[in-house]
Amino acid sequence: MDSGSRRYCLGNGRSTYTVLMTTPDYTPYVAYARGQAALRRQQAAERYRLAWHVARQIAEFLRREYRPARIIAFGSLVHPDVFGLHSDIDIAVEGIPWPEYLRAWNGVEEQFPAFKVDLIDVDIVSDLMRQRIQEEGQEL
């Protein structure tokens, strides 16, 4: 590496890239890219905290209005390393009969528009999905 070259490590939280720049004029661009990556990580962390807050509010709403047997958060919400700026909230419920389940889902969408919410009826999903919810899910 000659005196006019520098190595820079750039990352997005999931992977890191090493870039060899042959001119010191790229230094401001690298600093900007690093700053943007840090900002996205901070925004994702804030959205993650907000998502958990909203998930707990959804659970309170469902308990008050529909009295499900269980309410379980799963998906990216229980995996902070994969939760991102565009992640939704996945919530599984047990014990809400049809068509009350459809009313519950509609109520959740109307009451909590800040996030896309997938409200899953555990009683009708595949065995594989039910197993995934049971293994990774967290009770709300």
Which sequence ranges carry the predicted segments?
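Glycine-rich beta-strand-to-loop/alpha-helix junction loops that act as flexible
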Residues: A73-S76
